[in-house]
Amino acid sequence: MAVEFDEETMQELYTWVDTIPLSRPKRNIARDFSDGVLTAELVKFYFPKLVEMHNYVPANSTTQKLSNWTILNRKVLSKLSFSVPDDVIRKIVQCSPGVVELVLNTLRQKIEEKQRLHHISADLSQDQATQNNGNTHSDKGYKSNGTELSPRQGARVDPASKTHQGYAQAANADTTLRFQLAEKEQTLILSQETIQILQAKLRRLEQLLLLKNVRIDDLTRRLQELEKK
């Protein structure tokens, strides 16, 4: 294996795959994952709505295997900001040792990254809902204060003046809130654009890394074969 993919990482990957229920017995990972079906099942385990299993046909033929991986690349992996290069796919289809492990390890990282982003998004939504609930309670409080003021309490207040004050306060609060939301939305847009740029660069680097690792594996195996002769 390449230097970047040590034995400990390999074992962690196998342990991770073993925790996921798959439709076939786990025998030889290079052959088991060569047609892309189990890779699709693996992603579906974490993101059920992301994968439609009828698109992936169990296959022994190279043509069908390539078709499965092409669909998987386009419809699923791309949504995880991940793409497997064509020459790497060909090596997976040919059951080249050590290649599918590199892809699965990167896929595992992408799945974990998407899960983290999902949790962050859920937390932000919850915070926004909490803030909205707080604003609703404040509005009720203002109405309550308005109804409690009465001539019986010794204070004669012009109803038109009181109403005007209430509207002015509400308008100021609403303007401030809109301004804050606009600032947050602008910050979020800028952050999303930055993330997209970084993800594009990361995808390119990951593809280059996969290609390099596959090349190193090939050279290592050839060297070992020469040493045996």
Curated annotation (Swiss-Prot):
Residues 7-115 form the Calponin-homology (CH) domain. Keywords: Cell membrane, Cell projection, Cilium, Cilium biogenesis/degradation, Cytoplasm, Cytoskeleton, Membrane, Microtubule. InterPro entries: CH_2, CH_dom, CH_dom_sf, Spermatogenesis_Ciliary_MAP. The Calponin-homology domain mediates its binding to microtubules. It is found in: Cytoplasm, Cytoskeleton, Cilium axoneme; Apical cell membrane. GO terms for molecular function: microtubule binding. The gene is spef1. This is Sperm flagellar protein 1. Disruption phenotype: Morpholino knockdown of the protein at the four cell stage results in loss of planar cell polarity protein asymmetry, defects in cilia polarity and affects microtubule asymmetry. Its main location: cytoplasm. The keyword Cell membrane applies. Microtubule-associated protein involved in the stabilization of microtubules along the axis of migration during radial intercalation. Promotes the establishment and stabilization of an axis of microtubules required for the active migration of cells into the outer epithelium. Microtubule-associated protein that promotes microtubule bundling and stabilizes microtubules against depolymerization in response to cold shock. Essential for ciliary central apparatus formation which requires both its microtubule-binding and bundling activities. Residues 123-136 have a biased composition (Polar residues). Residues 178-229 are annotated as: Essential for homodimerization and microtubule bundling activity. It comes from the Eukaryota. Residues 122-169 are annotated as: Disordered. Homodimer. One of its GO terms (cellular component) is apical plasma membrane. GO terms for biological process: axonemal central apparatus assembly; cell migration; cilium movement; filopodium assembly; lamellipodium assembly; microtubule bundle formation; negative regulation of microtubule depolymerization; regulation of cytoskeleton organization.
